[in-house]
């Protein structure tokens, strides 16, 4: 591998590889910190360019510290996207890049030959449990979507961060987060410098659709069709733009795609139809014997529409994402997993319902989740603004949604260890992986958690575990 590089050389390299002339205001804020050595928490809107900070820190760690970098994400799709992006930009520099997201029963010894490893939180937890020897040579841990600490899988993420800092003194941690009110708490927990920015490359307009009008507060868009979905899509296509619909279930995403296909199909040019026909064949032939879902997806793709959810085959997902980025597909109907980081912006993001099925029945989604979905509106380089649209069913609901969501502030991130079943499971996991072996080590381990930072009630936590 090449010799060490100065900060200026690394900055120049990152700008070149991304085709930028300069860093944006959020990135400049981060560069004012000690990004080469200190841990850092970056809290900024979706699509503000946080991954550029990750690229700078990664190159510095590999070239100057001669240590490995671990990049952990909440989703396989996200890890895969980052992996492909890095391979494309940097593999010619002699950086050995790997991805490891499956097979939880292995220490994945082969990874000792790589400099940069993309993984998921669950896989990283497994690598730590199996005491992969090469972990001792990690100099930088990048935690993508650290706001996921509050989610149902947040306890695993918290445990992974605690364990990595436990076994590696002086580990540099770079935590990337959507906009959250208590980013300072996470920074204190990680003993990290804090970068907070509201910068977005494309101006975001948030509005509410009701009674054939999209109200954006400062202006309104009147639509003609009585069916709101059709009206929004027709208006978007007339503007030569794309729309992304976030649906609460896979079935809803598929059904909406079926409904919209004939509308979109009518607007396609012969050249576009030919291109989509070829794409449709690729989607269909991913499997030797296509399933019913494969056939449905292929038939929709031919009409310029696709659905996107976790049930798609990896290769199909890749084809769909690429075609949407290239504007071949005009409308995408997706489940909210897509909001969690996969970079697929559209001029318009439409959210027909803010309710989700949970264990306790139908519940409104958190403001934070809405803001993440809305943040996908607007394509840098293509749009000067992006529009995020919520659908209201009545005038009072419209006002309430405006106050709660459009003007709403995302919720604080809180530790998932506050829930007893989760705490119990993580304690047993820490015992199984030999982080806890007596009362003292139990106390020491939990003193390093985000839970302890937030609540400071270590004694009551220990008492609960003892019970």
Question: What is the predicted role of each segment?
Answer:
Residues 2-43:
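Conserved pre-motif I regulatory segment
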Residues 59-82, 167-170:
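Conserved SF1/SF2 helicase motif Ia
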Residues 70-71, 80-83, 87-98, 251-331, ...:
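Conserved C-terminal RecA-like helicase domain
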Residues 315-324, 407-467:
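C-terminal accessory/connector segments of nucleic-acid motor ATPases
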Residues 32-36, 40, 51-66, 162-165:
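Walker A/P-loop NTP-binding motif
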Residues 162, 172-261, 301, 306, ...:
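Conserved interdomain linker/interface between the two RecA-like ATPase lobes of SF2 helicase motors
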Residues 171, 344, 348-358, 363-404:
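Conserved segment of the helicase C-terminal RecA-like domain
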Residues 117, 121-125, 130-173:
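SF2 helicase catalytic motif II
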């Amino acid at each position: 591998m090449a010799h060490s590089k100065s900060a200026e050389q690394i900055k120049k390299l990152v700008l070149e590889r991304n085709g930028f002339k300069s860093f944006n205001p959020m990135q400049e804020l981060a560069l004012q910190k000690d990004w080469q050595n200190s841990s850092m928490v970056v809290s900024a809107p979706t699509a503000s360019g946080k991954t550029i900070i990750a690229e700078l820190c990664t190159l510095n760690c590999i070239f100057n510290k001669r240590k490995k970098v671990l990049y952990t994400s909440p989703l396989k799709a996200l890890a895969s996207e980052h992996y492909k992006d890095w391979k494309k930009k940097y593999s010619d520099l002699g950086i050995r890049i790997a991805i490891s997201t499956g097979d939880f029963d292995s220490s994945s010894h082969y990874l000792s030959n790589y400099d940069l490893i993309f993984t998921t939180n669950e896989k990283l937890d497994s690598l730590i449990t199996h005491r992969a020897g090469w972990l001792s040579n990690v100099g930088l841990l990048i935690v993508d979507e650290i706001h996921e600490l509050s989610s149902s899988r947040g306890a695993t993420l918290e445990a992974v961060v605690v364990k990595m800092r436990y076994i590696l003194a002086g580990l540099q941690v770079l935590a990337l987060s959507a906009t959250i009110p208590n980013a300072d708490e996470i920074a204190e927990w990680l003993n990290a410098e804090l970068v907070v920015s509201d910068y977005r490359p494309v101006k975001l307009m948030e509005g509410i659709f009701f009674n054939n009008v999209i109200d954006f507060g400062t202006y309104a868009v009147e639509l003609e069709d009585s069916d709101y979905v059709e009206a929004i899509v027709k208006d978007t296509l007339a503007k030569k733009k794309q729309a992304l619909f976030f649906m609460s279930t896979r079935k809803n995403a598929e059904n909406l795609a079926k409904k919209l296909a004939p509308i979109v199909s009518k607007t396609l040019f012969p050249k576009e139809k030919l291109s989509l026909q070829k794409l449709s064949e690729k989607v269909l032939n991913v499997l030797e014997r296509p399933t019913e879902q494969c056939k449905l997806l292929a038939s929709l793709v031919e009409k310029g529409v696709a659905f996107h959810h976790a049930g798609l085959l990896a290769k199909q997902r890749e084809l769909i994402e690429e075609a949407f980025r290239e504007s071949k597909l005009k409308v995408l109907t997706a489940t909210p997993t897509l909001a969690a980081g996969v970079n697929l912006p559209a001029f318009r993001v439409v959210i027909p319902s803010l309710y989700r099925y949970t264990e306790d029945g139908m519940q409104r989604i958190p403001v934070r989740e809405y803001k993440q979905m809305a943040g996908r509106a607007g394509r840098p380089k293509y749009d000067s603004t992006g529009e995020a649209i919520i659908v209201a069913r009545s005038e009072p609901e419209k006002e309430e949604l405006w106050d709660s969501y459009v003007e709403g502030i995302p919720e604080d991130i809180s530790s998932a260890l506050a829930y007893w079943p989760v705490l119990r499971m993580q304690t047993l996991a820490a015992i199984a992986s030999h982080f806890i072996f007596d009362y003292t080590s139990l106390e020491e381990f939990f003193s390093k958690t985000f839970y302890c930072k937030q609540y400071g009630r270590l004694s009551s936590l220990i008492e609960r575990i003892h019970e």
